[in-house]
Amino acid sequence: MTDFIGADLRGSRFERTDLSGSQLWAVDLSGAGLRGVDLTRVTMRGVELVDVSIHGEIQNLTINGVDVAPLIDAELDRRYPDRAKMRPADRAGFGEAWDILERLWAGTVDRARRLPPELLHESVDREWSFIETLRHLVFATDSWVRRAIRGDPSPWDPLGLPWDEMADTPGVPRDRDVRPSLDALLALRRDRMATVREVIDSLTEDALDGDTQPVEAPGWPPSRSYPVRECLLIVLNEEWEHRLYAERDLAALDAARTAGQGSARPAAGCRLSGLESPTSQAWPNGSVKPPWRCTPHGTR
């Protein structure tokens, strides 16, 4: 264990660093940026939270004695009435949720088509471009539907895109340099969305409540059994949240173009939320934490 007492570490970069169990006393974190940070079971006392923006997976967050997580969920459901339908309880609910996502994504794609094609490869505020977002959703479907539910040991298309921090895994593509056209990605997306539709339509209630069979091959997710319901909920969440991010960033790109300011700030996009990790983590109930889950609108 190393002690830093009176140290000047301003501007330091900590990446893939284990600081679990650390004690921070009278520490200046003003202006700090935390991304993909696990703050599970962190206790803060006597802190000053002024002009702070937090986007992430929030559960059991108590601020000044008040659990604010239910309040946040309720407000997001109020802003987006269809959001609550992304937590279906039965097969019919999953079908309705997928209907909603198909409709919403059709509108988002129409909006993207109104921009110059080159802007669809642009990053806004270090997030994935629109094309990269579509590639990531292909990867999500391949991983959780084609591999986990349908049992294909190697379902990935070369254009699929895992999250940036995912460890290299045999057979899993991660080509960040390829620049496919929108039409090429949409053809792939139509195929994957049709696959999800087929799975949902063919499910019985018993199958929905069942578990997948482990796929005995390296890949993602890791080889083990998963609740079928959990696999589909991950896909619904990915589709819902990433569309909101895409809408936000398309609006920024369009505004910058209209204002004649050129492209938005390009940078390598990556998304890592509190449930997005290169390694699976155990929930208190013993199940495996979904390896990624997009966070509420505002970050990826």
Model-derived regions, located:
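Short, contiguous alpha-helical
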Residues: 117-171, 194, 211-266, 270, ...
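Single-residue "anchor" positions within short linear motifs
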Residues: 278-281, 298
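Acidic/histidine-rich alpha-helical segments that form the ligand environment
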Residues: 93-111, 169-209, 230-235
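Active-site-adjacent scaffolding segments
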Residues: 55-110
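Leucine-biased recognition of intrinsically disordered, low-complexity hydrophobic segments
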Residues: 272-278
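Tandem repeat scaffolds
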Residues: 1-75
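N-terminal polybasic/positive-inside topogenic patches
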Residues: 274, 287, 296-298
